[in-house]
Every structure is written in C-alpha cells, then in structure tokens.
C-alpha cells in the first residue's frame, strides 16, 4: 500500500496554507508556538491506514509506504495486531510507522521500519483531546522489530490521556536516531507508567520535555 509521500504532503500543506491564510494571520501568536509555520496546515494530511473505534483487526504481510503523515494509526481501538510488515517513509515529515493512540491491547512484531519520523509512537491524545476524554493507551506489546532509519520507538509526545503497560523486547534500534524515547511538552499533562524494555539494542535512551507540537 503506497501513497504520495513527501510530494503529496507538500501539496496538501501548500493548499491548506492558502485556504487558512486569514486564520493564520489572525492567530499569529498561536502559529508562533508551533514547531513551524507549516504545523497547523499540516494537520489535515491523511494517514495511510486509519482505524477509529475498531476491534479485532489483524494487519499482516503488508508494505506500508509513503503516507503523507502517519502510516498506520489506531485510535480508540482494541485488539489490533500487526506483524511481518514493512514501513517505509524516509523523507516524509511526521512520517511515523505504527501509532496506537488511546488504544488498548495492540501488538506489533516481526516488522521493519525505515521512516521519516518515529518507527513506533504510542499516544493518547493532545491536551484537551487527551485529558478530558481520558482514554489511555495500555497493554501495548512490541517485539522482534528492526529500525534501519528514523527516530525509533517513542512514547508521546501526544500523551495527555496517559500511557501504561508497555512492553518492548528483542528489538534492534541501533540505526535509529532516538533509540527509545519518552517525550512530552512541559504543559501537556498525562502520565507514563509500567514500561518494560528488555533484550534490545538502541542508539540511545531519551526521557525529556520537547518544545514543539504544543498547540491543540
């Protein structure tokens, strides 16, 4: 399954900047708080595969390539299994591979990643979307995966609803930029607890606050 990648993302952002030009000018202070002037227009980029309120889904043996944003996104979903897949999105801004978001019982194994951002990003909503709805991501299992390019396995930064019971093992993140990372903005809220990492190789381990992606 392939999409237009960076070319499609650039076209969508350019069109949305024109569509929102009056709004962006009126809300210049909000734009200044974002990662860059393309952040808000970039929100409309589609996921390659999006699952909303889904149950009991198995994704097996696919190559997911060059989504304009995240490649597989599961939100408010339960019991999602993904295995023996390849995620390819080098050069795509925010080109995450596999993103469970306010979802439970999600399992990922035997997959390869060469992504433009996080290989895996475990999320639970951003700001009010997360802390008012209050649905954590929980019981997330990732094993026997390899990242050859991209940022590695991440918890956050959209995690206002909380993240708990994450188990990661037998993963090779040697060639990833971040290795294993826990990140949030200083005012985001939420929590991370019950994370286990074992028998992995990683370029580094990061636990930190980040200054971007704070709008919402």
Short names for language-model regions:
Residues 1-216:
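Extracellular/periplasmic carbohydrate-active domains that bind, remodel
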């Amino acid at each position: 399954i392939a999409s237009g990648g960076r070319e499609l993302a650039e076209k969508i952002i350019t069109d949305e900047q024109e569509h929102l030009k009056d709004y962006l000018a009126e809300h210049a202070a909000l734009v200044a708080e974002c990662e860059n002037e393309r952040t808000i227009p970039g929100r409309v980029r589609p996921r390659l595969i999006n699952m909303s309120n889904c149950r009991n889904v198995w994704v097996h043996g696919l190559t997911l390539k060059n989504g304009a944003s995240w490649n597989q996104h599961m939100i408010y979903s339960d019991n999602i299994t993904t295995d023996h897949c390849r995620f390819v999105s080098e050069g795509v801004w925010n080109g995450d591979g596999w993103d469970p978001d306010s979802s439970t019982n999600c399992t990922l194994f035997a997959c390869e990643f060469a992504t433009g951002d996080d290989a895996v990003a475990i999320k639970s909503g951003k700001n009010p979307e997360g802390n008012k709805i209050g649905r954590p991501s929980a019981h997330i299992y990732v094993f026997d995966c390899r990242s050859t390019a991209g940022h590695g396995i991440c918890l956050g930064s959209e995690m206002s609803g909380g993240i708990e019971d994450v188990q990661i093992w037998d993963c090779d993140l040697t060639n990833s930029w971040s290795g294993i990372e826990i990140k949030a903005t200083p005012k985001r809220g939420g929590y991370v607890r019950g994370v286990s990492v074992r028998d992995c190789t990683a370029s580094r381990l990061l636990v930190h606050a980040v200054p971007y992606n704070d709008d919402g």
